[in-house]
C-alpha cells in the first residue's frame, strides 16, 4: 500500500505541470533559447514542519514495556500446572525505583522482563505489591543502574470533563511507544473486570486503549492522571476506554506504605434509592431528596449489630446522601460508597441514620469482608481441592464457574446469593463434586456430578478442611449426602485405598489435595477478623 500511495501522490504533483505545457503556445523562432541555467525555475521553498509540542514532556524516559510469562491455574485438573501464556503490557517509573502497572499485567506471573526505550536489553523484574481489587501493581528491577537515567512521573488530580488526555503504551504488542489522544467522557463508579466484583471510581476516555496499553500512564499537563486498564471491544462500543484515577492510585500507595497491602474495606450492605414520593412519605422522610434505604446488612461485615434492615442512611462523615445515592466529593457527584473507598482497615466512619422515624448517629469500624471473595476471580494462588476415590471436590467460586460453566440451578443459586442470602453462615465453603476420574470403584456415580455436599456420615460439612478430615477418619463406609432430594453417595474406604495408586498414576494426580486459603474460622463473626 505504501508504494501505491506514493505513486498516486507523484501523479498529482506532475499532472498540472503536463497540462500547462500542452496549453502554452510554442515560442517564436526568432527568440533566442534561454540557457539551461537561465531557464531553470527557482526552487520552491517548502516549509519545514514544526515538531508539535509535547505537552507531557519526553515520556520515553519514564515508560517501560513489560513482557510476562504466566501460568494460568487449571481448575479441571488442579493438581497439574496450568497453561503457559505470554503477554505484553506497559508500565511507568514512579519514585522509589518502582514501576507502576496493572495487576492483570503481572497476575499469575512466573517470569517478568522489562525494556527501556533505546536499550536493547531485557531486564528481569519482580513484583513488589499487587492489588487485584483495584487492578494495580508495583514491580521493580534490581539490575544496577537501571533507574539511573529514568524520570519518575508525578501524579495529578481528577481531570475535568471534556479535557484532553494522552494515553501511552505498547498496543498490540508493538515494540515502540504509542501515544493516543482523547477527551475525558465520564467520571463514575465502574466494575473493575480484573476481579469481576469490585467497583471503584473510574474515568472513561475516548483515547484508543488496546491490549498492550494496559498499565501505561494517561497524562495531562505533564502529570499522570490515571492508569489505562480496560475498555470495550469495537463490537460493543467504539472509543470507550477506562483508566484507574488518581484517588484509587493514591489509596493503593498509602495502603502499602507499611509494607503490606490490606485491600479495600466495605460497609457490606445493600440499599435501594428513595426517589419515590409515596415511599418517602411512608417512611416519614422530609421532601428534601435525601437518604437511601438499607435492605441487607451482611452478618460478616462491620455494620452487623450497628445497622438494621429498614434503616435510612442520610449522611456519611457529614456528607449528605442524596436520594439517588450520590454525595459530593471534591466538586464531583459520586456514589456514596466512595467515602468508604478512601478509608482503610480499622478506620471509622460516622453514619447519620433514621430508624423507626427517629434520627440517630452511629459509628462503624471498617474492615474487609471475606464472603465477597467467592464471587471474584482469584490470582497468584493454587486451586483448592480434594480427590478421594477418583471424585474431585472443589469449593465454589467464580473461577470454578468459568471453568465448568454449570447449568445446575442449585449451583447458580448458591453462587449468586451466597452473600445476599448469607449462605456463608452455614457453608463458608460450598463444596461441589465437580468431576469424576473413571475407575471401577466409582462407576454409576455420574448422576452425582455437580452435587453440593451437605454432610458425610451425618456430620455437616462446612469447609473443604471438614471434608478432607472426615475422609481421613476410620469408617466402614462414607455416606455422602448432597443438598436436595435423592439417595446418598456411598464409598467403601477399603476399595478407595486399594484403588488409590492406580487412580493417581492413571490421571497423573501428583497431589491428592490442596487445602490452602480456606476460611480461618467457622463463624461469620470470626471470619470477619482478617
Report the location of each language-model feature.
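Active-site loop architecture of trypsin-fold serine endopeptidases
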Residues: 109-111, 147-150, 168-181, 191-215, ...
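Conserved active-site neighborhood of the chymotrypsin/trypsin-like protease fold
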Residues: 72-73, 95-177, 211, 359-361, ...
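A conserved glycine-rich beta-strand in the N-terminal activation segment of trypsin-fold
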Residues: 47-54, 73-96, 102, 121-124, ...
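A short, Trp-centered hydrophobic/proline-enriched beta-strand micro-motif
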Residues: 58-76, 167
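Bacterial N-terminal signal peptides
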Residues: 5-16
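Generic structural signal for buried aliphatic residues
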Residues: 99, 112, 159, 165, ...
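Gly/Ser-rich catalytic serine loop of serine hydrolases
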Residues: 82-92, 151-156, 172, 198, ...
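C-terminal recognition in membrane/secretory proteostasis and scaffolding
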Residues: 21-45, 54, 61, 71, ...
